[in-house]
């Protein structure tokens, strides 16, 4: 916080998802995965935003169970909470979630993002320039998100080239 960092993203549910292929989460695994949130809130309260990364590892019902358990922690967003193969399920999740949905770095074109936007499930549009078709396609996706009055959060886990391109996109897109 003293260095100006006001947000962090964590993914403590992955271990539990790997145990069941995302089909269930035990009470013990849920408790263990919530521990980092408890520690963060105890240490800094609400002075830092906490984003939750789900890596698209969960089926709908356990994801909804996790979302409800996260309610007391006022998380900033839930990123790819379920597999992106059912936008209907994502819409159901979004309706029950205490946090907006950030989706989805895994989508590969403006047409996939259009389908996502039309559901109303996404609160934040997360695109990855290296996976969505490059900078030109990302700019078109950002423009669509702007039409829906949604912010864009570029995703990058590949390195400096995509980071630089994402920075250029962020400076160009008003959202």
Where are these regions (language model features)?
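Metal-dependent enolase-superfamily TIM-barrel catalytic cores that perform enediolate-based chemistry
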Residues: 1-97
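Shared catalytic-loop signature of beta/alpha-barrel
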Residues: 68, 74-77, 85-175
